[in-house]
């Protein structure tokens, strides 16, 4: 009998959810940086074997929203609780288990299997790990607790095996050749946004949205026009930099990553525009694809 199901990955910001997703899928589906709130959307990555299809879903980190964009991000995370066949709740050894208790209480009430993954165990010793496990067991008594290190791939194979055991008997939900639910344009915008997260500080990376206006592929090359939206003129100046140096660096590094991602030559043009206070506008958020429904 064939098995299939939705395995949703949730947890607080910066606990390694996207790194874990990429390790489980075996492809770089989600961008991952050292900064919190890197993931903004819910992204599916699909693992297929002859007997099984696992539809993983990476989600934004759980947070208390300060503006409408963060409200949408939280809604993506909460939607992952309602359609999971198996839930992966990711934490790290240094995290306060009581953080975002409201969300945790919702996880505790779930009737599907919950696997609590304590990530980055290479940063702890045996005694402290035992204390962490005990604390989490008191908060999520029905969850199975598995220590892992997503970055070092420790425990990932064991986790995949356990997920396979928990999945329901079901035909595949997606074509067996399909790797994700997102189109190519989505990954272009995410790769460009990843470079912005890496190369800019403070509020700039969080005030940015990237859209792809043109994506034309021929036999030898992909032609891409992208727009970086910021909220204020001053941010536009910072993104472009003195004599355009900063934007050129983003463009060059994005092109390299895109060529690696698509496996062919890329011609990339990036423009910068101001869309005032887009993070607080429902209309703009909808146009940028931040509607969780």
PLM features per residue range, with description:
Residues 51, 75-143, 216-218:
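Conserved C-terminal guanine-recognition region of P-loop GTPase G domains, centered on the G4
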Residues 184-293:
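P-loop NTP-binding site
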Residues 39, 62-64, 96-97, 124-125, ...:
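Catalytic P-loop NTPase motifs of RecA-like helicase/translocase cores
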Residues 27, 46-50, 84-87, 94, ...:
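Conserved, well-folded catalytic cores of nucleic-acid-processing
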Residues 16, 155, 246:
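Conserved glycine(s) of the Walker
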Residues 113, 122-180, 184:
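Canonical P-loop GTPase G-domain recognition
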Residues 58, 119, 149:
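Active-site glycine-centered loops adjacent to acidic/histidine catalytic or metal-binding residues
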Residues 1-75, 79-81:
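Conserved G1/Walker A P-loop phosphate-binding module
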